[in-house]
Amino acid sequence: ACIGAPLLIEELKKRGFKKGICIVGEPTNMKIIDAHKGCYEYTTYFEGLAGHGSAPHKGVNAVEYAARFIDKLLKIRKILKDKTPKNSIFNPPYTTLQIGGISGGIARNVIADRCRVDWELRPVIKEDGVFVNNEIDKFVNEELLPEMKKTYPKSSIRKEIIGEIIGFDREEKSEACELISNITGDNSREVVSFGTEAGLFQEIGISTVVCGPGSVSYTHLRAHETREDR
């Protein structure tokens, strides 16, 4: 996710480029977006010890440990909801966390030695992302892994960072938003829960806005479309 933007940011830094306007083209129905949540995506891999299903005590079931991992994430999700920032401008107003997929095992009567969990969180504030990672890493290193290694020392749990997109914060005065307003005649401002590269450009001082034709409701679908008049 956002592989090209960080490279561009580094090049801009090298050239001393600190001012200007960035328009991030995304399907917003030409609405002016001046803030969005972050988007952190991960895949966690579990490796245990296979064996016959009749002797589960002799193996390390990766699927079962992955299930406990997911249960912990769901408990953390409840905490995130309870930590909803006051006056949050987002919908939903809190940091979201969801499990996108789980796969592992080869048969009912075989102890699963491998499993993977795909998961993501969309933090309202950067601190929530730090909190989630600290909590789940602590659970893995202090509870799950020690148990797995008691039976099979080569057991492992590995987290792969697919992408960590920082949030895009609302600013009282935005040159980029004013430019789009002058072009479209729309003075309203909206927020979205999906992620873009906007926060990366904002972070180095470039006035940034997210705006473009089409609707996000059609994204990631086969029937992706936009109106001709847009």
List PLM regions with ranges:
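Metal-dependent amide/peptide-bond hydrolase catalytic core
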Residues: 43-222, 227
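Acidic/histidine-rich catalytic neighborhood of metal-dependent amide-processing enzymes
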Residues: 1-41
